[in-house]
Amino acid sequence: MVKTVKKEKTETVDVSSMIDELATKANVALKAMEDFTQEQVDHIVHQMAMAALDQHMPLAKMAVEETGRGIYEDKAIKNMYASEYIWNNIKHDKTVGVINKDEQTGLMEIAEPVGVVCGVTPTTNPTSTTIFKSLIALKTRNPIVFAFHPSAQKCSAEAARIVRDAAIAAGAPENCIQWIEQPSIDATSALMNHPGIAIVLATGGAGMVKSAYSTGKPALGVGPGNVPAYIEKTAKVKRAVNDLIVSKSFDNGMICASEQAVIVDKEIYASVKAEFEAHNVYFVKPNELQKLEDAVMNEGKYAVNPAIVGNSAEKIAELAGISVPKGTKILVAELEGAGPEYPLSREKLSPVLAMMKSNNAEHAFELCEAMLNLGGLGHTAVIHTEDEELQVAFGLRMKACRILVNTPSAEGGIGNIYNEMIPSLTLGCGSYGKNSVSKNVSSINLINIKTVAKRRNNMQWFKLPPKIFFEKNSLQYLQKMENVERVMLVCDPGMVQFGYADIVRKELQKRKNDVKIEVFSDVEPNPSTNTVYAGTKMMVDFQPDTVIALGGGSAMDAAKGMWMFYEHPDTEFFGAKQKFLDIRKRTYKIAKPEKTQFVCIPTTSGTGSEVTPLSLIHI
């Protein structure tokens, strides 16, 4: 059945036909960009960034006027960020053809477009998100079709038009950037699910993101945030409070990475509160708390009241029937805890901040976790502290993909201002937030990377002792070996019975130094683990610096096992016995000897044990 939505009172739009046309044109543009060079792509994207930057102020004005939300100056900054910071970050990215080649490994990587992108944008950051998504899409030779939030349709479309016209003037195909002109839920759904769309790049509420992931195609959807900020007792209070105000008041708190609650250690709670109050932050009185909660939250939907999103603190106070001083930047609600029973501990997307007192770091961590579990899993968590060990502990504990330290969260979370994270206006929340990405989304997420692998035969190997002496009378080398003070001689009973052990002993006694000698002569044919362990015990008791294996393969194999366990008592027989296909990749690594020399003196030829690293032990 054909779905229709009203365009005007007397005109309807065939949604199916409209989306078909957009997708068809986009795929024509995709084909046209197949043969673009990296230089062509970079020129196009640079011109787009320049055009957006040139119009950052008019676009900000349009966004504020159309949506009735946010702050003009801050939206202008966001538009500049989406143009300047994003371009600066991606301008050197290789996104066309061969992007990496390694002659040694024989591997070559080739970048290909993912295909036509469906870009869904929010009302909170409409123009900046449109600019951002357009830049990373065209940088990767992917046409993009937008579904704008209905309450920000005009300003978003103008942002798209500006970068589209600049792209076309620079050589891009005509329909490289398009958008739905009559927005509706049906149209957005039809676009996301259209077979001509390759991937969905969605920014918005949890419901919309869930829809993006339900299309059966790749999606880069990112969820909401409910960001906790912990001010620990060692923090620099003035800086921490300033960071909170800078972040929470920016664009009236509409960046999803902005703080939603501040948790403060009891030792500094009073000083933090005083610092807030000194900077035009209003603390709601106990008898005003319910009024604020009723105005800000829609508990029927367990979410913020859309009417207050992006409004000023003064406007929200007025809606709540609370009298505040002129110039109030932020409204703070002091809460006993975080969770469903404290509605103001949810995401508020406005200059309304919850504040809680923590008894210690563990209590603070628990409150932060409660915040994240209330709709903020995977997004962002902040800690202000001078304790570096606590910074690490916080990072290990919090289920958030951005852990910010001593940083304004809104400006820190989007990256590249207060840190070296990837700059982005689409922030992944990982599996915590049911997202496919955990990092800040950028151009790297919009390319397919093909790997060309040339044939390389595995290197073959064999291992020999560092020194091999042969010919008659080679045994005399024992007289000249360095660092020989205590010798453990390992052999079978026959070597003692027939005098071969004495021959070795006499050579050692010809040395200038006095050599202590201990003999283990209980090696049987095909030695067992019990024999190896018995010899190892003797070594541990005697503490030799040199081990001499005398005899056939059995004696040498047993001596190798004893040597290994003597050198590294924590070696596991179970691991050491495992087979391997490639010695460089063996699952169980045997540590190298560090304190003992090892000498093999074969009395037979055949096993080759004296020149191999292998040892045959019967279990």
Feature locations, PLM:
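A glycine- and small-aliphatic-rich helix-loop capping segment at beta-alpha/alpha-beta transitions
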Residues: K133-K139, I199, G216-L220, K236-K238, ...
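ATP/NTP phosphate-donor binding region
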Residues: M459-T546
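Short, well-ordered beta-strand elements within core beta-sheets of diverse protein domains
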Residues: K25-D35, C118-G119, A261-V264, L349-N360, ...
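N-terminal Rossmann-like NAD(P)+-binding subdomain of aldehyde/semialdehyde dehydrogenases
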Residues: V2-M108, I136, A278
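C-terminal segments
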Residues: V2-A23, D42, I90, Y282-N287, ...
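Rossmann-like NAD(P) dinucleotide-binding subdomain of oxidoreductase/dehydrogenase enzymes
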Residues: V98-R239
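Glycine/threonine-rich beta-strand-loop-alpha-helix active-site module
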Residues: N530-I617
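ALDH superfamily catalytic-core signature
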Residues: V5-K6, V13-V15, I131, V209-G339
